[in-house]
Amino acid sequence: LKPVNVMDQDWVGGGAAGEPATGSSPSLSTRVFDLQAACVHFGHPARAVRALSEVSLQIDAGERVALVGANGCGKSTLLRLLHGLTAPTSGQIHSEAALRQAMLFQKPHLMRLSVQANIALGLWLRGTPWKQAGVQALAALARVGLLALAQRSARQLSGGQQQRVAMARAWALQPQVLLLDEPTASLDPHAKREVESLIEAFASASQAMTLVFASHNLGQVKRLASRVIYLEQGRVLADLPVHDFFSGPLLQQQFPAAHLFVKGELV
């Protein structure tokens, strides 16, 4: 494990550069993330806002981890910390640097280029020859149903279509670690269902992939997650297998705040 590097570009995946994955997948014993008392504060030290407080957790290769909690609880900050876009104010975070990462945000970051070029550029920056990158971009667009729009300007697409382009961009990178920061939060119900279906297809097609995602869709959490982390005011209050998180008695007895959250979200 090596200390994670803070990156300044948040529109493409992190991790190792270059070609699609070959060879064996990482074993389940690989420690992908290791956080020890990680804190993230924003603003002037005298009036700092504590986005994360003393977060300690480990995530291994192949795990499917859902981050849940009310708005402002620290889910997005934790994902950005894992991806290297935010540095800890104190504490430590270690990341398995050899694994390719990709991240999807609530609002996709697309450039004033064609849809195809938005995807191909990320591949090219990682060492894929430009012509090959273009071919791989078209294949990724076909998987999300946008091949016919390959030459359209990405900025002219609807919100749902733009998020599907972001999905295709992540798909093309063939990430071993995928981080999702509520990518359907700003979409209308129809587009939300489309993108959620793509996310579930992506996860199902890549069983060895490590998935960490923030979501208010508890149905999707049940379908995708093997483990649920509940955050409140920047702290981890519950970290349980998905069955235990939704089973009721254990959550209600040991983590009453998380139980009330789940009960409210399911009403």
Predicted regions and their residues:
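The feature captures the beta-strand-to-loop junction immediately N-terminal to the Walker
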Residues: V68-A70
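Helix-to-loop junction immediately C-terminal to a conserved catalytic motif
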Residues: H83
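Conserved ABC ATPase "signature" region
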Residues: K131-L149
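Conserved ABC ATPase signature
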Residues: S153-L157, Q161
